[in-house]
UniProtKB/Swiss-Prot annotation:
It comes from Danio rerio. Keywords: Phosphoprotein. Residues 208-227, 253-272, 298-412 are annotated as: Disordered. InterPro entries: BSD_dom (IPR005607), BSD_dom_sf (IPR035925), BSD_domain-containing (IPR051494). It comes from the Eukaryota. This is BSD domain-containing protein 1. Disulfide bonds: none annotated. Residues 373-390, 400-412 have a biased composition (Acidic residues). One of its GO terms (cellular component) is cytoplasm.
Length: 412
């Protein structure tokens, strides 16, 4: 897990660093472009101001009459202003589209505007080290170039250089043959020119590549912005829906112990969230289940009553005589009201719809009376016993209850 988190952090840091680097490069290019434009504007404004001033002075000097001395001074000032004007604002036919403009003075007293390549060539021609020192770079490269160089083929060019370039002519007259030989002089010169042309070609290629890169990056940023806007406009929100899980219905059972004098121990179980249509089940023969089922409620209460020993004896007697128990038809929703007499606890019967002390609602929704309950009780059970047997069973029950009351009082 740690390795996964480290990889994630490393990838995130790498992406962040790359994004910051790209943004910084873009900002640098913008600043560089702004500075270039600013310098161009300042240079143009300055040139315009100087030209306007020179033209104003020329006009003023032309209007005013002067003596011969004044004419000389005026001519000198006019020449100076003309040089400045031609330098800062050259005519269209002499304008060179380049990054660097160099003003070079000629032996005739005039000036020429050179670009960076021409300026370096002029500097190379006027430098004595070009002819005296060994060529720069690896010797193998110089030997390779020398194998393709022919001095005889350059005679016309050499003659033109000696005529048109006073610097080369002066250095050639001074050095050949005192310092260097004629062949070495021109070999070193043309090799320097060859290296200068290579550097110029590399510079132009780099410039074009930088311009193409800037153009492609600007197009890439525009495409990314448009794509981001399109995706942001058409993206759909995702809704994670989790269906509700039905909670398990767990019955909660509560056991309540009451003194034997009032009622036997009872266990009450409450079942929540149960459907209203519940069919009670029949339990063991030794337990009586008064069950309350409410149709509109969401709970079922089951009360378990422990029988007395007399009830067990009476139950055994009833089973010997072949008592047949008849279950009444299930009623929708009986309701518990009061406790029935002690005899209802002793008779071990299965009650599904009504308790001894509860009124049973009829089919039309009205509550029944205790008389109806007694009649239903008599109809449900037909005891095949004599009157003497019933009296004997009741006397045993009374005796048992008296003994239990005495035991309870003695225990207290």
């Amino acid at each position: 897990m740690a390795d996964g988190e480290g990889g994630w952090w490393g990838g995130w840091l790498t992406q962040s660093f790359q994004s910051v680097k790209d943004k910084s490069a873009e900002a640098y290019e913008f600043i560089k472009r702004d500075l270039t434009e600013f310098s161009s504007v300042v240079q143009h404004d300055t040139a315009c101001s100087v030209v306007a001033t020179a033209n104003a002075i020329k006009s003023k000097l032309a209007v005013e009459g002067s003596s011969e001395t004044t004419e000389k001074v005026k001519k000198g000032i006019t020449n100076i202003l003309g040089v400045i004007t031609d330098t800062l604002a050259p005519p269209p036919d002499k304008t060179i589209d380049c990054d660097v403009i160099t003003l070079v003075a000629t032996p005739t007293g005039t000036t020429e505007v050179y670009d960076s390549g021409k300026a370096r060539l002029y500097s190379l021609q006027a430098d004595p080290a070009t002819y005296c020192n060994e060529p720069d770079g690896p010797p193998q490269q110089f030997d390779s170039w020398l194998s393709t160089f022919s001095l005889e083929e350059r005679k016309a060019e050499i003659s033109e250089l000696l005529v048109s370039s006073p610097a080369i002519r002066a250095l050639y007259t001074k050095m050949v043959p005192a310092a260097v030989a004629h062949a070495e002089f021109w070999q070193r010169y043309f090799y320097k020119v060859f290296q200068l042309e290579q550097e110029e070609a590399r510079r132009v290629a780099l410039k074009q590549r930088a311009e193409q890169t800037d153009h492609s990056e600007s197009l890439g940023w525009e495409e990314e912005d448009e794509e981001g806007e399109f995706l942001g406009a058409t993206s759909l929100s995702r809704l994670d829906f989790t269906p509700p899980v039905e909670e398990s219905r767990v019955p909660a059972v509560t056991v309540a112990d009451t003194p034997e004098s009032s009622s036997p121990p009872q266990a009450v179980a409450s079942l929540s969230n149960v459907a209203s249509d519940v069919t009670p089940s029949v339990s063991s023969d030794s337990v009586s289940f008064p069950t309350q089922i409410e149709n509109q409620a969401e709970s079922v209460t089951i009360r378990v009553t422990q029988p007395s020993p007399a009830a067990d004896e009476l139950s055994q007697k009833l089973s010997d005589t072949g008592l047949q128990e008849t279950f009444p038809e299930e009623r929708p929703a009986p309701r518990e009201e009061t406790a029935r007499e002690d005899m209802a606890q002793d008779l071990r019967v299965f009650e599904l719809n009504s308790d001894s002390g509860k009124s049973t609602p009829s089919n039309n929704g009205k509550k029944g009376s205790s008389t109806d309950v007694s009649e239903d009780w008599e109809k449900d059970f037909d005891l095949d016993m004599t009157e003497e047997e019933v009296q004997m069973a009741l006397s045993k029950v009374d005796a048992t209850e008296e003994l239990e009351d005495e035991d309870w009082e003695n225990w207290e």
